[in-house]
Amino acid sequence: MAIERTFSIVKPDAVSKNLIGAIYNRFESAGLKVIAAKMLHMSSEQAAGFYAEHQGKPFYDGLVSFMTSGPVMVQVLEGEDAIRRHREIMGATNPKEALAGTLRACYAESIDRNAVHGSDAPASAAREIAYFFSDDEICPRG
């Protein structure tokens, strides 16, 4: 397997519960290295742009509202098969369907407030990383 990068968000619900450290511990325990990270409070414009592919869907307005409701942590993770591994750690989008021990099974409140976001493919990972980070903000750790 090749070393790859993925994009991740610790969403406002998890940040407000002080779960950043616990979530980062899960990433690192699974062999994923945090190579860029920052806390920010997304503006409506940032959230709308990030989730533009969902515009017009019934959940879009609620998603933008939720993602702007408080601070988030955005990060780039690097490791072997990082996209798949990160998605396994997160669990199913709906926490009721998430396997026991996954982040969403442990920390999500609902399908709408599901603690974390992760890229689903190499193309989306590249796009999402570039949305929040410039190349000089990414620090490979070897």
UniProtKB/Swiss-Prot annotation:
It is found in: Cytoplasm. GO terms for molecular function: ATP binding; metal ion binding; nucleoside diphosphate kinase activity. ATP binds at K11, F59, R87, T93, R104, N114. PROSITE patterns: NDPK, NDPK_LIKE. InterPro entries: NDK-like_dom, NDK-like_dom_sf, Nucleoside_diP_kinase, Nucleoside_diP_kinase_AS. It catalyses: a 2'-deoxyribonucleoside 5'-diphosphate + ATP = a 2'-deoxyribonucleoside 5'-triphosphate + ADP; a ribonucleoside 5'-diphosphate + ATP = a ribonucleoside 5'-triphosphate + ADP. Its EC number is 2.7.4.6. The keyword Cell wall biogenesis/degradation does not apply. One of its GO terms (biological process) is CTP biosynthetic process. It is an enzyme of class 2 (transferase). Its cofactor is Mg(2+). Gene3D superfamilies: Nucleoside diphosphate kinase-like domain (3.30.70.141). It comes from the Bacteria. Keywords: ATP-binding, Cytoplasm, Kinase, Magnesium, Metal-binding, Nucleotide metabolism, Nucleotide-binding, Phosphoprotein, Transferase. The active site is at H117. One of its GO terms (cellular component) is cytoplasm. Homotetramer. PANTHER family: NUCLEOSIDE DIPHOSPHATE KINASE (PTHR46161), NUCLEOSIDE DIPHOSPHATE KINASE DDB_G0292928-RELATED (PTHR46161:SF3). Belongs to the NDK family. Major role in the synthesis of nucleoside triphosphates other than ATP. The ATP gamma phosphate is transferred to the NDP beta phosphate via a ping-pong mechanism, using a phosphorylated active-site intermediate. This is Nucleoside diphosphate kinase. The lineage of its organism: Bacteria, Pseudomonadati, Pseudomonadota, Gammaproteobacteria, Aeromonadales. The gene is ndk.
